[in-house]
């Protein structure tokens, strides 16, 4: 793949994805200002994912028929404008929920069309590495909004954080529209029942349900790791815990930018199932433990959190690569869309479930519930191996 194109798409996605978790970055501030419960905050986070799921199938079909560059650009624009409206008009639970729904609809136009371009422009031998770089830009972009919050919140307030991150998404739109990106293969073949059966074949379903378990854990953790670190530092008596909590959370999320490259590269060498199993078991172990560590030393909690941030995302590009490896090119956009819908349907639930158990339990219970839901993924990987389903083309 042309490295210039790969880095162009990755930089554009980095800019767009700052919208994804900018609400999580300001959550401790608006919870206090708007008198939100943890359950309500989790629902606002989940509403973004609902918008994503509602829109992603449309974008997936469109990316198989039309140049996905334009889905990417206009999705970024919608995400950015909805963020500007959030900064100007959000004043409570309902307005925040509606505007975050619009942001999710916009971001749906970025990830799957971008992944289709990367998958089809990459040779199979290095596809895992290329997709790892692209997913890494999602990770770093998502985490960067936490960094922006840590730096700007005291001077500019939560509105300033939303404003800066939303303008980044609008800049992404301009960057894509002004750039020359090779046109990937577009399908003139109608989507038939026979083609759809390939998308829902056993091997696809096992990969996709494994991905769903991964998404359940990942997006609950990403949504709540900032508030968790803020709370942890408050319990330790750290001055300006809000700033340090968000800065720590940004490091925890952004370390995943390295992890996705490493995970993609490892899948090229080890195979998909083996690489997924390594990372998912480590991240589940972190989910089971971190919420119960509030009395542990700061250095130990930060170390476990960094391991958590690395392992929880390292396998993410591998699920995308696995689908790309086993899917006919003419329906790749739809296949990636189906995977995304299934995975992100779980993310509509998990942040809200986390908030519910946090309201009625504690951090340990909330993280443990997330870990239990993630156990579906190693079971799916075991089923794939037992059935000897090949996940790489020979």
Where are these regions (language model features)?
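Residue-level signature of mid-helix packing/kink "hotspots" within the transmembrane helices
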Residues: 21, 49-57, 142-143, 253-261, ...
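Extracytoplasmic gate region of multi-pass secondary transporters
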Residues: 23-24, 205-257
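Conserved MFS/SLC helix-loop-helix module at the cytosolic interface between two early adjacent transmembrane helices
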Residues: 54-90
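Cytoplasmic membrane-interface "Motif A"-like loop-to-helix N-cap segments
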Residues: 65-75, 268-281
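C-terminal ends and interior cores of transmembrane alpha-helices
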Residues: 77-91, 282-295
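Cytoplasmic helix-loop-helix junction between adjacent transmembrane helices
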Residues: 99-137
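Helix-loop-helix hairpin linking two adjacent transmembrane segments in secondary transporters
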Residues: 133-177
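C-terminal transmembrane helical hairpin of 12-TM major facilitator-type secondary transporters
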Residues: 271-319
């Amino acid at each position: 793949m042309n490295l210039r194109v790969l880095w162009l798409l990755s930089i554009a996605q980095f800019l767009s994805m700052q919208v994804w978790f900018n609400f999580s970055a300001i959550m401790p501030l608006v919870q206090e200002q708007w008198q939100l419960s943890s359950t309500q905050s989790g629902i606002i986070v989940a509403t973004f994912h609902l918008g994503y799921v509602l829109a992603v199938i449309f974008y997936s079909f469109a990316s198989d028929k039309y140049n996905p560059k334009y889905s990417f650009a206009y999705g970024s624009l919608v995400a950015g404008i909805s963020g500007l409206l959030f900064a100007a008009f959000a004043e409570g639970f309902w307005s925040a929920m509606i505007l975050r729904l619009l942001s999710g609809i916009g971001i749906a136009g970025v990830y799957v069309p971008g992944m289709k371009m990367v998958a089809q422009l990459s040779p199979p031998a290095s596809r895992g590495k290329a997709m790892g770089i692209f997913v890494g830009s999602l990770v770093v972009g998502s985490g960067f909004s936490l960094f922006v919050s840590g730096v700007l919140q005291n001077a500019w307030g939560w509105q300033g954080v939303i404003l800066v991150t939303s303008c980044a998404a609008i800049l992404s739109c301009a960057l894509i529209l002004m750039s020359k990106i090779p046109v990937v293969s577009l399908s003139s073949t109608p989507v038939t029942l026979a083609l759809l059966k390939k998308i829902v074949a056993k091997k696809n379903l096992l990969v996709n349900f494994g991905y769903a378990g991964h998404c359940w854990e990942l997006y609950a953790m990403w949504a709540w790791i900032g508030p968790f670190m803020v709370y942890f530092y408050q319990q330790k008596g750290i001055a300006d815990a809000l700033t340090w909590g968000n800065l720590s959370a940004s490091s925890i999320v952004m370390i995943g930018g390295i992890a996705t490259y490493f995970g993609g590269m490892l899948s090229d060498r080890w195979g998909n199932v083996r690489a997924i199993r390594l990372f998912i078991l480590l991240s589940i172990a972190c989910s089971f433990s971190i919420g119960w560590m509030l009395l542990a030393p700061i250095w130990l909690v930060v170390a476990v959190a960094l391991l958590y941030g690395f392992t929880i995302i390292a396998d993410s590009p591998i699920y995308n690569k696995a689908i790309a490896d086993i899917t006919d090119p003419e329906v790749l956009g739809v296949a990636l869309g189906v995977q995304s819908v299934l995975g992100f349907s779980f993310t509509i639930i998990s942040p809200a479930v986390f908030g519910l158990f946090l309201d009625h339990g504690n951090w340990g219970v909330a993280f443990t519930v997330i870990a239990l839901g993630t156990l579906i993924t190693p079971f799916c990987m075991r089923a794939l191996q037992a059935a000897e389903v090949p996940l790489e083309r020979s």
